UniProtKB/Swiss-Prot annotation:
This is Chassatide C13. The presence of a 'disulfide through disulfide knot' structurally defines this protein as a knottin. There is a cross-link at G45-N75 (Cyclopeptide (Gly-Asn)). Residues 1-24 form the signal peptide.
Amino acid sequence: MAKFATQLLLFVLIASLVMLEVHASNTFQVPDLGKRLLMNRDPNGFPCAESCVYIPCTVTALLGCSCRNRVCYRNEL
């Protein structure tokens, strides 16, 4: 009887892990960059990964970025 109980417990644990994996894979989806940009629209434009707290936009100015609210932004199209 103890062997049967051990096998049943092992089966239930494995089945639980499989079901957890199936449910987790269906709900976990990373949105692509386009969706993230559309969902998090900033009225200033797109951040250029440079701040302009003490020094104005230097490297990203070549890409068309300008300083607004102490962050370098590129105007939206």
